[in-house]
């Protein structure tokens, strides 16, 4: 219908403009156009393009009507040809899509299609040959073929492991990894508590016995029996310890009557004797406490941990004893000499027993802890927590920390004791670093 309307419009326009043209000429032109359309249809359809016809159709002639019918028939033939040509194209598109879908689906590769990602020059055929040469009888017996360094994962050959690493045992790990030592046995919680109470009872028994011997046992025994004449040795009592410390630290205490200890309460002497006797019992019983603690933990310790424990604890006790002696011979005499020097001109020196012994015992205990600095530094370096160079680079920070602790914890508000203690801590720290540098650690 669209072709008929288009033909009608074209014929009307041609009638107005070309009315004088010859009818035969128009028919010959129509035949030429039909021949051109036939040739264009034989060449192939042109999609998306409409080619106008130049022929003019009239209604007054049968020849013209037959020409129009022939033209319409040719147009319909062209349309059918174009539809016929489009069908194979659609078939080709569907075939292409099906091929693309089939390429996306996984499929098994043939033997000749397998490729290797190993770079050239890195693959050794000798490994395949050695694998082919494996004795099947040896494989059946469970023996594995010897592996070379190249066959090992990561390229590490077993022969490259040092003898020290080969002798390494899980027990030497130190409890950080691996299983528990063989001596560790499962025990119920009540059994652990009973063992702990039993070992603590031993420690308390030893410390209590020493305390009772010093006070009041020694005083009673010395009053009843002349121990010097009977046993050849004088048993020291708490009173003897108090007199020794007082005469050693207070300047002129033996010659100046006013510098004898003053009592400002009815229980000061008794409490001071108990304090001194208890401190002596604790100090003497401390090795027993360390030994019982080691026996309690020994089943769960690795050999390396036992070695560290047995090396560190006696060293700590020795350092604590050195700190107490340093306080007794250096720190306390200097402090009390300073106290008496600036009070002699204005007042009578009369120290109370309780406050004086509190200061003495606190400073002795403080110096016992301060002298653990070399042990702490050594253990930190041995455990790879820090290095000597790291400590040396931050020495000013440690100096400030030492002085801050000395001024905060010291019982002396005048600043004399904190300065001595801070200088001692810095000296111990620097001396430890110097010793490590000298030994090459």
UniProtKB/Swiss-Prot annotation:
Tagged with keyword Protein transport: yes
Gene Ontology CC annotation, any one: TAT protein transport complex
Principal location class: membrane
A Pfam family assignment: TatC
Ranges where the record places region Disordered: 1-185
Highest rank taxon of the organism: Archaea
Assembly and binders: Forms a complex with TatA.
Listed HAMAP family: TatC
Membrane-protein topology: Multi-pass membrane protein
Keywords (A to Z) from UniProt: Cell membrane, Membrane, Protein transport, Translocation, Transmembrane, Transmembrane helix, Transport
Database matches in InterPro entries: TatC
Protein family membership: Belongs to the TatC family.
GO biological process: intracellular protein transmembrane transport; protein transport by the Tat complex
Function of the molecule: Part of the twin-arginine translocation (Tat) system that transports large folded proteins containing a characteristic twin-arginine motif in their signal peptide across membranes.
Gene Ontology molecular-function annotations: proton motive force dependent protein transmembrane transporter activity
Biased composition (Acidic residues): 13-22, 75-104, 122-138, 164-173
Subcellular location: Cell membrane
UniProt miscellaneous comment: H.volcanii possesses two TatC translocases: TatCo and TatCt. Both paralogs are structurally atypical and may represent adaptation to the extensive utilization of the Tat pathway in haloarchaea.
Transmembrane segments: 200-220, 276-296, 317-337, 357-377, 395-415, 416-436
Protein name: Sec-independent protein translocase protein TatCo
Segments of skewed composition (Basic and acidic residues): 51-62, 105-117
